[in-house]
Amino acid sequence: MNTNGSGYGHGTGQGNGRGLGSGGPSGAELPELPGLSGLRSANAARVLELLRVAGEGGISRLELAEGTGLTPQAVSKITARLRGSGLVAEAGYRASTGGKPRTVLRLVPPAAHAVGLHLDRDELTVVLLDLAGVLVGRRVVPLDLGAGAEAVVEAVAVEVESLLTASDPGGALSAGPLSGPLSTGRSSAGQVSARHPGCVPAQLPATPAPGPAGSVAGPGPAPWPAQPAPQPAESGPDTHTSHRVLGVGVAMPGPLDHTSGIPHRVTGFPQWDGFPLRDALAERLGLPVALDKDTNAAALGLALQTNAAALGLALQGSGDSFAYLHLGTGLGAGLVLGGGLYRGARTGAGEFGHQVVQLDGPSCGCGRRGCIEALCLEAVADGDLAGAARILGVGAANLVELLDIDRVLLGGRVVEGAAGTFVRGVGEQAPVPVELANGGPHTVAQGAAQLVLAPVFGRAEAAFSPPLPPSRTGQKIR
């Protein structure tokens, strides 16, 4: 297993603390997610990544071989498995300089999905993304993080199921292996019908029906760059497959240990300390689950955006460094250094809100006095948003001086309510560009879904819940 923090699978994320990147040794393992058991290799991830980047325009096998450095024979074997799984389909033909036209392959975004959860102190956001990272559905409901861990797990599971039902009225979304050669050998049909009599798999509609009150389901923005349209090809069996939920990414306030999936003493909610949230939710849903801090998830999602300019990132290659500062019910930071998500030696990096900037300042929930979080939230409570922005700017300037980062991105519920005030106020203090991270109100939840999606394409490492026993895999979400 790769130990530098940029590997794939059940990695620890130790070493340099970075979990973002597309590199990795040949043969490195990908997460053991439902439907991907035959593709846990760095080579398959590289092929999938090129298909993802190519978008609807597609890419030929020869171009895949040139782009990955693999032999044409290896590419043919990998793409055959991908087609059999339903993740890839033929997209037509493209003229070549000589000989017959080349067959073009494309990713099938609706073939698989990931759920992203943002557990805030008073609110739960659930999103569903397809393979291309496009928002398919979302649900926002009140949440009491202090209601007790078991009660929160059950409430979260119910909302996940509600969103999947709203986004998938045909009943096609389920947990378990995709049809085709990638099947784990355990048929899910009997389990699905046993739990849902009369349930018939169907295609996920292009425009999902709206869900119940509190939810919105609908297509996201077009994710693909403009490409020359290939000539249409005959549709084959690989274009028709049931749609699967690969896993669930969970983001919540820290501190926490993302490798074990266990929160520590969340400020104001000490009862979460030591609770095995990741594994408890995996057991309840019957899906692989990954857990990380809310700010880490947001930073990961922002760094992975295909259309970086639309989010105000303008990332230049893989070496960009930025801090994402999130001010909502608390204050924290997600750090991307040299292109890698930085978690620190003990996974605790980014506890930005608890740096002391006023020794005789107000008490903080962490037990100290004068923390920048306490000062910011006090100013917000007093209605002094400009003052809160200045305080946040002091902390941001300190962070820039310490880490020599390229830019500062702002997000969170409070910032979004007065974006201009915060961008100006922080920008007056910080010596680098300060921008609003235009991921919108669901930046954290969408980043959480990327905890599941990014490893599939070899773009990040992940620490998932242990493999579920055979009796729990391949089950329909209840």
Locations of regions flagged by a protein language model:
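ATP-binding/phosphotransfer module of carbohydrate and carboxylate kinases, centering on a glycine-rich
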Residues: 1-89, 99-101, 106-180, 184-185, ...
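Short beta-strand(s) of the beta-wing in winged-helix/HTH DNA-binding folds
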Residues: 89-90, 95, 257
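Short loop/edge segments at beta-strand edges and connector loops
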Residues: 90-92, 291-293, 438
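Conserved beta-strand edge residues that scaffold enzyme active sites
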Residues: 95-97, 296, 414
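Phosphate-binding/catalytic loop of phosphoryl-transfer enzymes
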Residues: 117, 224, 240-367, 371-376, ...
